[in-house]
Structures are given as structure tokens and as C-alpha cells.
A protein has these predicted regions:
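Short, small-residue-biased leader/transition segments that mark boundaries at the very start
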Residues: 1-2
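Short, surface-exposed ligand- or partner-binding patches at beta-edge/loop junctions that are enriched
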Residues: 136
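His/acidic/aromatic-lined binding-pocket segments of jelly-roll/cupin-type domains
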Residues: 5-11, 28-29, 52
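Short hydrophobic beta-strand that contains or immediately precedes a catalytic carboxylate
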Residues: 10, 95-99, 115
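Conserved nucleotide-binding/hydrolysis modules and their immediate coupling elements
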Residues: 32
Length: 172
């Protein structure tokens, strides 16, 4: 995979982001100068889930995975313990469960809202930038990507360290 280990910033030009769903190409987003892509796969260490194609002539800047982690991922991700997360929630913060609806329905945390990772970008205009958000999933894989995306857009996002699997008393 050509783009697997890089984070890209569009210096100039326009791009289309598409994903194959049921054999049909679905337009997910149109990107322009200043926008970036590739962060979800690098943060969550997951497989790329979309194709980005230039719509016009342009220039892309790229960071390799090591530089991305050192310069962007680690400075933006704020991991917190379950105790600190509960304190933030008690002071008006909000749990965000980024798992699939079927997982959320089965064992969500009290008061949590469900915004699956694939929908996080769609929530940018709805969430309050003045509120603390504690993001979680089972293992920290999806939640780290979601917390990064939120923090990158200026939200006060915190990552539940270890996810639900490493916090067995979380649901109490």
C-alpha cells in the first residue's frame, strides 16, 4: 500500500475521499488546501479504509509514521485514567463511545453518547468545543483515532487509557 505509513497535508489542489461500499464507490469528503488525511490509520494502526484521489493539480506534503507520532500524535493525545475520567464527567464532561452501535448498546458507560469512529468527523459541528470529552472503546485502538481527530480540531478530548478492557470496573 503506497499511503500506508504516511500522513498527508494538501498544500495546494483538491482531493476526493471515496470508499467502496457494496461494490459502489461512495464519496465521503472533498478536501482542499490545508486539509490532511491518513491520520486515522496511523493513530489506530488499522488498515486504510478509503481512497484519496487528486481532483486537480496540486502538491501534497507528507510525514512518515515516526515523525507523525513524535510531532503530532503524542502531543495531541491526552491519556487519562478511569479516576480522572470520572472526575471530568462529574464536572460536566461527556463520555463518547466510538464503537459500533451494537457494541455500544450492549455495554455502554452511563451517560455515554455513541459516535462510531467513522462518524466522528460528522460530529465536529455539533459538539461543544468548550466541553471535555472522554473518548473510549474496548481497547483504545478506535478511541485513540477519534480523540486525535477531535483534538486536532480544537476539542478538549481525552483518551481513556487502556479502553474498557483494561478498566474492568468501568461500568460500575
Amino acid at each position: 500500500m503506497l499511503f500506508r505509513s504516511y500522513y498527508y497535508v494538501i498544500e495546494s489542489g483538491k482531493c476526493r475521499v471515496e470508499r467502496m461500499v457494496g461494490g459502489v464507490s461512495m464519496l465521503l469528503a472533498e478536501l482542499k488546501s490545508g486539509d490532511a488525511f491518513g491520520e486515522e490509520a496511523l493513530v489506530s494502526e488499522a488498515k486504510r479504509n478509503a481512497t484519496v484521489t487528486m481532483k486537480s493539480d496540486g502538491t501534497l506534503l507528507r510525514l512518515d509514521k515516526q515523525d507523525f507520532v513524535a510531532l503530532l500524535k503524542e502531543p495531541l493525545l491526552q491519556r487519562i485514567s478511569m479516576d480522572e475520567a470520572r472526575q471530568r464527567i462529574a464536572m460536566g464532561g461527556q463520555w463518547i463511545d466510538v464503537r459500533y452501535p451494537s457494541e455500544y448498546q450492549y455495554d455502554k458507560l452511563p451517560g455515554a453518547i455513541n459516535i462510531p469512529l467513522a462518524e466522528v468527523r460528522n460530529a465536529f459541528g455539533v459538539l461543544n468545543q468548550g466541553r471535555d470529552y472522554v473518548v473510549y472503546c474496548q481497547s483504545e485502538r478506535r478511541s485513540s483515532a477519534a480523540a486525535f481527530l477531535l483534538a486536532q480540531r480544537g476539542y478538549r478530548a481525552f483518551l481513556l487509557s487502556g479502553g474498557l478492557w483494561n478498566n474492568p470496573g468501568a461500568r460500575a
